[in-house]
Amino acid sequence: MSVRRFLVWILALTVGAAPVMADRLKDLSRIKGVRNNQLVGYGLVVGLDGTGDKAPFTNQTFRNMMNQFGITLPDGVNPKLANVAAVTVSATLPAFAKAGQELDITVSSIGNADSLRGGTLLMTPLKGADGQVYAMAQGSLVVGGFGAQGQDGSRITVNVPSVGRIPNGATIEREVESPFNRGDTITFNLLRSDFTTARRVVEAINGRLGPDMAYAHDATSISVRAPRDPSQRVSFLSILENIEVDPAQEAARVVINSRTGTIVVGQNVKVSPAAITHGNLTVTIQENPEVVQPNPLAQGDTAVQQNTQIAVTEDPARMFQFGPATTLNEIVQAVNQVGAAPGDVMAVLEALKQAGALRAELIVI
């Protein structure tokens, strides 16, 4: 690609049309090949105030470390390592990270350590999925939680004291080669696959760069012809990713989390005409311990027996009706008027789906 044509592209992109209420391409997609990589390692945290673990693999790791320093422990000696904990160290290696840069790391106990507060992580290699070492970690931990325990076994714990972080605790030793500068095209992968959004992305790019500059492979991938020169490609991409696109509306979905009672209803959810009634059956069980004394002249011991009372109450069933093409606002108003609990709403939505009246995808997580 010539420099003249590249400058014409830059001028066309910077002039552009008037801004609209839309999302930037960088917010809707990710560039193919530009990704993070996960790193993990195994190491020791020392300097704990008696809150270390007593796992056998901690002693083995400690022996191996001593051997590396030329110190051999006699056979049969089992050191009491109350101040040492075996941990896993994890980090995320960003795209284009260079050797010498630093990473934040997370340190997590894998034994029965009570707390990592006040500990120091010894030098730990961090490896990638290919088994190669990409960073070295070491430093003092920052732990947000704490715990305390009494001699009678009672204890209190705030947050999670067995996990800590070390800001800038790892130094990158090896870089990951990126395919960013290879080939004649740059491919964007949409975060949410949608044929309509993919078509609009292609139209927005071609409208700014010219016809046939961008094309869609499927509902996820869109390729754009780009200059080969790395400096031109960076400038080209910095403007390309700021092109605004009006994404398609999401498909109608209702997401239910049965564990937390959370219900999320999408904007395009509608309900066909239906009448619903749902009653509540409440069972209450009360356990009242009572002390039973033996007769004055009888031989026996004082005992405690349970006095159980069971009560069943059924609230009157409420009926409400959905008209044709009922919208999200109408659904929310109907549910609020009858005072339905999240569990009741889940049951109603599942019944509507089975009856074919819920015109949306029902997802239970």
From Swiss-Prot:
Pfam families: FlgI
Single annotated GO MF: structural molecule activity
Chief subcellular location: periplasm
Record localization: Periplasm; Bacterial flagellum basal body
Claim: Signal is one of the keywords in the record: yes
InterPro entries: Flag_FlgI
Keyword set includes Kinase: no
Record keywords: Bacterial flagellum, Periplasm, Signal
One GO term (biological process): bacterial-type flagellum-dependent cell motility
GO CC terms of this entry: bacterial-type flagellum basal body, distal rod, P ring; outer membrane-bounded periplasmic space
Signal peptide: 1-22
The protein's role, per its UniProt record: Assembles around the rod to form the L-ring and probably protects the motor/basal body from shearing forces during rotation.
Oligomeric form and interacting partners: The basal body constitutes a major portion of the flagellar organelle and consists of four rings (L,P,S, and M) mounted on a central rod.
HAMAP family, alphabetized: FlgI (MF_00416)
Annotated family: Belongs to the FlgI family.
Protein name according to UniProt: Flagellar P-ring protein
Organism, scientific name: Marinobacter nauticus (strain ATCC 700491 / DSM 11845 / VT8)
